[in-house]
Amino acid sequence: MYIEMVDETGQVSEEILKQTQEILEFAAQKTGKENKEMAVTFVSNERSHELNLEYRDTDRPTDVISLEYKPELDIAVDEEDLLDHPELAEMLEDFDAYIGELFISVDKAREQAEEYGHSFEREMGFLAVHGFLHINGYDHYTPEEEAEMFGLQEEILTAYGLTRK
């Protein structure tokens, strides 16, 4: 999995950048998304507030904003076309590779780690996995969706070794 990471805050350590890369690759493997691409931008509460207002019409900062990328291709392609034109198949695969972008508030992660009584590393891992699942179609609007998403999220974090303690 290719992950572009940008730290707009200048506060994210190399260890956290490495952990974020690793846990997202781990989550991608667990969900069958290894051949995908995404971006992660670490932001301040101020920037998170701006983004939350712009994308969600919510006037406050938030911990993670997930922007799922859903490309629309306005052409019909059948299997014969793909067999006759392997370059078309490759182009379509590349077209579908980018899955989205996460904006993680470093300030909120610190606040929440303290509030929930676990490490900053755990909170950053949690936010990365939570956002990753959102850009891959998981949600928590209904009790059933919540059980599925939160169950998978906890399974990934625990298997990776980021527990609440």
From Swiss-Prot:
Top-level EC class: hydrolase
EC number: 3.1.-.-
Any coiled-coil regions, as ranges: none
SUPFAM superfamilies linked: Metalloproteases ('zincins'), catalytic domain
UniProt cross-references to Gene3D superfamilies, sorted A to Z: Metalloproteases ('zincins'), catalytic domain (3.40.390.30)
Keyword rRNA processing: yes
Cofactor note: Binds 1 zinc ion.
Cofactor dependency: Zn(2+)
Matching Pfam families: YbeY (PF02130)
Subcellular location field: Cytoplasm
Keyword Metal-binding carried by entry: yes
GO cellular component: cytoplasm
Function: Single strand-specific metallo-endoribonuclease involved in late-stage 70S ribosome quality control and in maturation of the 3' terminus of the 16S rRNA.
Family: Belongs to the endoribonuclease YbeY family.
Record HAMAP family: Endoribonucl_YbeY
Protein name per its UniProtKB record: Endoribonuclease YbeY
Native organism: Streptococcus sanguinis (strain SK36)
Gene designation: ybeY
